[in-house]
Every structure is written in structure tokens, then in C-alpha cells.
């Protein structure tokens, strides 16, 4: 799947200061794709580990293969994740392999954020993509950039709804609990290559 997973990972390492310059898969100089065969084919074959920090926390990033041929390597990694970021191409939408990944994330009960990539390209439709996610994968997908974000979050749980009705907002701790329990899946839209929306993730 050419959704831009490694490009996003390189970008996260770059903005955190862990890389001086982000590599590019198409240029064959991606930091995370460091095996010759990976650079030759332009895909991730082996899971890689990298560390980066934000002002509030330290993170260990695991960049996993996205191609269907290397699903075993990816599934092995899922079993140790605290959280996952699932990348979807804005030009392709939900594919059959996306559904497979989603079933695995559900099986291993991994709280999941979504980054819908390549939104800078022609033909992408944010509303249509969000509707497709809900139709194909289920409920709980919320566009965290939308004006009605709080209302949509409130629909994901009783406690969240009570807080929203009383205060017009939902507490961060409640949102975190919804994400942890896989009742809420925050969605972010952008372009990893052009650094649009990437810093939010």
C-alpha cells in the first residue's frame, strides 16, 4: 500500500528533532527503509524502531510493513503496540488490505488514530472519505479538525454526552478513555510529504 506510511514516520522524526533531514522513499534515502532491497523496491519489508520526544512524552515509533506480502511481520508488531496510527490514502480510500489491518487492530485491541494522507491531491473528498470509514469499518470515526468535533465525540459514549450537554465540551481525560477503549478513532487529514496536518499526529 502506497499510503505514505514511511513518509509520515520520517516527518514525525524530523519535526521532533530526531532527524536532521527527512528522507524520501522515492529518492531511496529514507532513514527507516535502510535495507538495500527496501530502497530498491520502495517499500517497507521489515519493522523498524525509532525514538522521538515531544514536550509532554517520549515515544517509541514502530514503522511496520504496509504491503500485503509482508503482513506477518506487521501482525507480529501489532501485538506490542500501545497505540497505532493507521494511514489511508485520500485518493484510494478504504481498500481490502485496510479492512484486513482493521480486523487485526481490533483483534489485538489496539487504540487507533487515523491519518488520511495525500489530501493535497486532486479528487480527494474529506466528507466522502469519513463517510466511507464509517460505512465500511464501523462507528467512532471523528474528524478532529471539524467545527462540530466535540459534538461528534460526545456521540461516542454516555459520559462524554453528559459532559457535552452540561458544559458544551468533553474533558480530555474522557476523550483519552474513549480512544483507549476503541470507542473513538480520531481522524486527521493532510499530506505527509508536504508537511500538512502531520504535526497534529
Protein language model annotation of sequence segments:
Residues 1-3, 21-22, 90-201:
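P-loop NTPase catalytic nucleotide-binding module
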Amino acid at each position: 500500500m502506497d499510503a505514505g506510511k514511511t513518509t509520515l514516520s520520517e516527518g514525525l522524526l524530523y519535526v521532533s528533532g530526531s532527524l536532521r533531514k527527512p528522507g524520501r522513499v522515492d529518492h531511496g534515502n529514507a532513514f527507516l527503509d535502510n535495507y538495500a532491497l527496501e530502497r530498491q523496491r520502495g517499500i517497507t519489508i521489515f519493522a523498524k524502531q525509532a525514538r522521538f520526544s515531544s514536550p509532554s512524552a517520549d515515544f517509541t515509533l514502530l514503522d511496520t510493513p504496509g504491503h500485503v506480502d509482508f503482513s506477518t511481520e506487521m501482525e507480529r508488531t501489532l501485538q506490542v503496540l500501545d497505540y497505532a496510527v493507521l494511514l489511508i490514502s485520500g485518493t484510494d480510500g478504504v481498500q481490502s488490505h485496510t479492512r484486513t489491518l482493521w480486523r487485526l487492530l481490533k483483534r489485538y485491541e489496539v487504540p487507533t488514530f487515523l491519518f488520511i494522507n495525500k489530501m493535497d491531491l486532486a479528487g480527494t473528498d474529506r466528507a466522502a472519505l469519513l463517510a466511507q470509514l464509517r460505512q465500511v469499518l464501523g462507528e467512532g470515526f471523528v474528524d478532529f479538525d471539524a467545527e462540530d468535533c466535540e459534538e461528534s465525540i460526545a456521540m461516542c459514549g454516555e459520559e462524554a454526552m453528559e459532559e457535552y450537554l452540561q458544559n458544551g465540551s468533553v474533558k480530555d481525560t474522557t476523550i483519552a478513555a474513549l480512544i483507549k477503549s476503541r470507542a473513538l478513532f480520531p481522524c486527521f487529514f493532510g499530506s505527509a510529504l508536504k508537511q500538512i496536518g502531520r504535526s497534529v499526529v
